[in-house]
């Protein structure tokens, strides 16, 4: 086992604080509308330019083991906040640094670290309650756009794109962000349910120009197994022909004489039909077929349920206003399923998302949820260079996460003002002086956001804080972009409650652990041994 170095008390905390400061100072320059960029060197390719706090934090690794421990713990604050709320990483880092700094001073002055921690926890709990009480629910598309704009560092177009995407696919819909091949950023929305399987034969195409099969007002047959025997299918085919409506078959596969007969009938014009492979594999395929059945008001023909293909009637088939099938994708628009059934299925999938521990399963469940709940939107991020596209994509990801958080828990005035106001509303009392000091640490730390935003904008922080607190109005604050004061909600400068709350709770949690640290252990750096000398060449005592 390698030898370890141990540091105690003040010297340990000083080292740790130095690491916290290095990381936090690099991250906090990105805060606010006038925050600066950070350039990150990459071992291959061009350097990366970003204003995303968590991206900066993840790149920092310090040489000194003890300083690095402090930095990594604060990095954990940023990562955890990003995982839960998707934004607010810089906010969390600034708050953590402020609490650690003040806490370290209090411990150095001889206060009990455990009482300080209890005081911090009391104050944070009260601030969280105050934030939730002040939260304003989001109702309009314009408010969604405002949240997106603020998180994208004031780029209005990003906010508008996100608002439009949410309006079209619903709050539960999937919105993905991809890199575009062009210089323009564009929004593409797929309404209805789309899955990545195309027609089994190009002969099913109804529009040869676009090579798609468009079937209006169609019946949908959902079959769990392969279809190769035509005889079993005849009763259902005859019933559909009599209605004069098209039929879409979705099965594990359609092959042999079954596929050949369908193609021949389609070409002769006797039957409007198309066949598609079912999406997914294994259990996921079963679940997705069930989703399509609920969406279209049909039944999955499955041996598990004891239903045979020969006995299928028209009322077991799903219905849809339009089914569009291309070489790669199938889209079902406006299925005839009961709204209550779809809502029940959505609730069931949401419960599975809560329970699953696998990120992959969660992602797949969210895709299924979106397809049932409304659709899928794709924001394609354009730019002149690869570096610009990556930087913009970071901001759009942040803005999207912030917007989702705002829809969940509501919004409060932005620019750090909500926390600044909450600092004046902390009424809880500690049971002793040390706990009271812990409460005051939080009071002071809650000012740090407004101060940092003002500093990044080149203004005097103390004057800004003083002016905001002079007016006893919750929404009154400072617009760093213009340097003016006013009603921040009316100006569209807002923060999602979930982001602010998560940032504060995570910052306080890690900061109070750092304050209560009394010893640190790290491996001693290995001494590089000198290279052994090479033995002399040639043969001794010989002259050449």
Curated annotation (Swiss-Prot):
Major subcellular location class: cytoplasm
EC identifiers of the protein: 5.6.1.7
Per the record, its GO cellular-component terms are: cytoplasm
- Tell me where it resides: Cytoplasm
Provide the function of this protein.
Together with its co-chaperonin GroES, plays an essential role in assisting protein folding. The GroEL-GroES system forms a nano-cage that allows encapsulation of the non-native substrate proteins and provides a physical environment optimized to promote and accelerate protein folding.
Identify its protein family.
Belongs to the chaperonin (HSP60) family.
Name the record gives this protein:
Chaperonin GroEL
- State the species of origin: Agrobacterium fabrum (strain C58 / ATCC 33970) (Agrobacterium tumefaciens (strain C58))
